[in-house]
Curated annotation (Swiss-Prot):
The keyword Repressor applies. It comes from the Bacteria. GO terms for cellular component: cytosol. This is Transcriptional regulator DauR. GO terms for molecular function: DNA binding. Pfam families: HTH_22, PAS_6. Induction: Induced by growth on D-arginine and D-lysine. Keywords: DNA-binding, Repressor, Transcription, Transcription regulation. InterPro entries: DauR-like, DauR-like_HTH, YheO. It comes from Pseudomonas aeruginosa (strain ATCC 15692 / DSM 22644 / CIP 104116 / JCM 14847 / LMG 12228 / 1C / PRS 101 / PAO1). DauR represses the dauBAR operon. Belongs to the DauR family.
Length: 210
C-alpha cells in the first residue's frame, strides 16, 4: 500500500489480489475509490491503466443509485481482445457508496477454444451411420440399449448393484443382444462382471422359460 492509499480499502485490495490470482492470467481486478474518483488499486494489470487514473464514476455517488452488482457487460481491451466485466459497488457502514470493485475477464481465449470445439463437434460434419458398417454392429446396439436403460432409471454405469446387472442382462437378452458371437464377453466387460455370471443369468432365464 502506497502512502496515498486509504487504509480503509486495504481489505478490498486483498480481495482483488485473491480474485486475480485465482483466475491468473485471464482476470484483472480494479478498485476505484469513489470519494477521490481515482483508480486506487489494480491487480494483474491487463488494461494498461495506472493507479491514480481518473475513474469517471461520479454517477455512482448519486443518492438514488442502489445498485450493488452491475453486469456482466462486455468491452474491448486496448489490444482488441474482448473483456467481460462485472462491477460491485462497495458501501460503508452508513450505506454510502465507498468504492467500486471491477472484475475484468479476458474471454478471447475461451471464445477461440469454443469456436474450435464447435467446429470439431459440429453435427453438420457428420453423415448418417453407413449401413454397410452398422448393419451387424451388435456392440453399437448393445451400447445404445444399455445407456437408454440407464437413463430411464437414472442410474450410472459405475453404480450398478448386482441386481441391476442381472436385470440388465435379462433386458439385453430380450432385446436379442446376445446373438453376436462375442456379445456375452462384451457385456461382461462393460458391466464389470464375470462372463460366467452372465451365462448363469442367461441359463436361469432359459430354465425359467422351459
Amino acid at each position: 500500500m502506497s502512502p496515498s492509499q486509504d487504509p480503509s480499502l486495504e481489505n478490498y485490495r486483498a480481495i482483488a489480489d485473491g480474485i486475480a490470482t485465482l483466475f491468473f492470467p485471464h482476470a484483472e481486478v480494479v478498485l476505484h475509490d469513489l470519494r477521490s474518483q481515482r483508480v486506487d488499486y489494480i491487480a494483474n494489470n491487463l488494461s494498461k491503466r495506472e493507479v491514480g487514473d481518473d475513474s469517471a464514476l461520479e454517477d455512482m455517488l448519486e443518492g438514488d443509485s442502489d445498485e450493488r452488482n452491475i453486469g456482466p457487460y462486455e468491452k474491448l481491451n486496448w489490444d482488441g481482445q474482448k473483456i467481460r466485466s462485472v462491477s460491485t459497488v462497495l458501501r460503508d457502514s452508513a450505506g454510502q457508496p465507498l468504492a467500486v470493485l471491477c472484475i475484468n475477464l479476458n474471454i478471447s481465449l475461451f471464445e477461440s477454444a469454443k469456436a474450435a470445439l464447435d467446429l470439431f463437434l459440429s453435427p453438420s460434419k457428420l453423415i448418417p451411420q453407413p449401413d454397410a458398417l452398422f448393419r451387424d454392429d451388435w456392440q453399437e446396439r448393445i451400447n445404445t440399449f444399455l445407456h437408454g436403460w440407464l437413463r430411464q432409471r437414472q442410474l450410472g454405469l459405475n453404480l450398478l448393484t448386482r441386481e441391476h446387472k442381472r436385470e440388465l442382462v435379462l433386458a439385453l437378452h430380450a432385446e436379442g443382444a446376445f446373438k453376436g458371437k462375442s456379445a456375452a464377453n462384451y457385456v461382461a466387460n462393460v458391466l464389470n462382471m464375470g462372463r460366467a455370471t452372465v451365462y448363469k443369468h442367461l441359463k436361469e432365464l432359459k430354465e425359467g422359460g422351459d
